[in-house]
């Protein structure tokens, strides 16, 4: 498959009926497809024949699709499935009605600063969640950002991300990315960290503000500019952009990764602060509008050809237009991309509290007047705090398991990083319920001598939001390879770092304050002790440990979960 390949519209690909070609790129084609087994409409990415036959890429995609599947953040496009059919690799994603940011910029020209900041804030939230899970994206660019009609933004194409927990696959790694947005260290032998994503997102912010990437020209000149050329100042390129944005761009695009912002959240907060006061309120209004838009959930049944997905409900009180006016760029012939189901993601953001925490760090310009969400169905996945852990699952799930972990325990980290995504999927599908238990018997092995107890306490602060997906996401993030402390290490994590981790997965200010205050330390000690007693009742003392209700689970067998849920 290449750029000149014929469309496969109307053909069958395994269980998928390819309805419409909606995108074509160097890695393959994207189709609107009907999954005839699960009876749903999806976005199906078919990788090119060249990549499908490349063993290095095959290994990369298998690893990265699993990494992407672990991310439970509303601005990350969810991956349903991935695999291979007749020698061709594919990724099955949820479908969205939206247009990519590159097409938007070509059509409309530069964005008003409040809108640019609001979109970057949402993508930064997605990236921070990925970084907390041990993944980097490596190809942040406008083409990989989808924006719905109500300005809800999504980051796509985590399939070529590089999980920092995995051994590098350098044969292909040197070619991943787009020159206009690549950090200087990507062109050298230096190890590229997650801060390369922060650099790329800053380049995207610059382009949103000015209409053009920071550096332009042929490949060699763009590479050289990223490495040696002075960082451009957006205020000198487009009249009316506040001078304060110059410092934001300068830090986000610093040549030395250590001089950049620590997180994408820091970048977006600085960008918001650079706005004029009135525009800060407009940016907050745009975020509120995107998060509270109400949409019906698309039907899971096959849709007849020509049927259109529901459009986002416009927000009644749109922000005044930003000046000065600019002439839009020539209209592109490129069609909007139909992608991941915005309706489902927005509903999740509303019901689960995983959306942007508007109360922090940005001010709101007025009270929120959205109607309360409807009550969940009786069989919905729910969260219950127990005396020795936290239950997450549906009352109709046929199997309930107990999972015991210790925040410092290295094998626990490996276990969670390997199986969290599959467990979360089984819970969401109501095939499985989980009682999560966190112990603290390695406190003495931590630098602070109480890290495990503090991590357990943080988990109960997050559980207090009564959001099952949020809790599972935070539980998994505690074991991220770039977050979990090691035994007898020279340092561990502070309460502020635990609070920031909670913020990256979508925790509300009340949970963050709870973590910083240490208010739940006593509760954590009691519940960790109770969990240890429960574990002892299974004639076990070490972690990780999994109990299926009748016997010990051999999680060393990669098929253990599939066997458990049938």
Curated annotation (Swiss-Prot):
Organism classification: Bacteria, Bacillati, Actinomycetota, Actinomycetes, Mycobacteriales
Summary of the knockout phenotype: Mutants show increased resistance to nitric oxide donors, increased sensitivity to reducing agents, and growth reduction at pH 7.0 and in the presence of lysozyme. They increase macrophage apoptosis, and exhibit lower rates of survival and multiplication in an in vitro macrophage model of infection.
Topology, Cytoplasmic side: 1-337
Subunit structure: Homodimer.
Modified residues (Phosphothreonine): 11, 50, 59, 170, 175, 178
Annotated segments matching region Disordered: 296-330
Gene name tied to this protein: pknE
Induction: Induced by nitric oxide stress. Repressed under oxidative stress.
Statement: the UniProt record of this protein carries the keyword Phosphoprotein: yes
Modifications the protein undergoes after translation, according to the UniProt entry: Autophosphorylated on serine and threonine residues. Dephosphorylated by PstP.
Positions of ATP binding: 22-30, 45
Membrane-traversing stretches: 338-358
Membrane topology: Single-pass membrane protein
Main location group: membrane
Keyword Zinc-finger: no
Record function comment: Important for survival of the bacterium in the host during infection. Promotes the survival of infected macrophages by activating multiple signaling responses and suppressing apoptosis of macrophages during nitrate stress. May contribute to the adaptation of M.tuberculosis during stress conditions by maintaining the cellular integrity. Can phosphorylate the FHA domain of Rv1747.
Protein name in UniProt: Serine/threonine-protein kinase PknE
Topological domain ranges for the Extracellular compartment: 359-566
PANTHER family cross-referenced by the UniProt entry: MITOGEN-ACTIVATED PROTEIN KINASE KINASE KINASE 20-RELATED, SERINE_THREONINE-PROTEIN KINASE NEKL-3
SMART domains the record matches: S_TKc
